[in-house]
Amino acid sequence: MGDFRSRHLAQNIESLNGKILKIDINNNNHEIISMGHRNPQGLYFDKENNFILETEHGPKGGDEINLIEVNKIGEDKLQNYGWPISSAGEHYGGKSEENKKKYEKYPLYKSHTEYGFVEPLLTFTPS
């Protein structure tokens, strides 16, 4: 599920925005699989090797392919992919004066792991 232009919700565990969900179709229960996503576009589940590949639109540039390790689901620390704190992309309009407050709140660090997030398998800039 995307962040619906409410960036901060991608890092809020109480919100479903910016999360990948596992939904039980028999009882409609759900489980958060991962968080920190901007705009997920596609999922591929490799049942044999127990992983998910997720494609995601970044902001201006910074599209991602993320590896979600299914065997880590349910561990104490949820897999977090960093949005809106880390991204290979930039905010639309770049680092202009009008975007100054946006970058202060959502800096889009180029490293994910340096800030405690899972690094994408691949990023595409420009995209």
PLM features: residue spans?
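Beta-propeller domain segments
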Residues: G2-S127
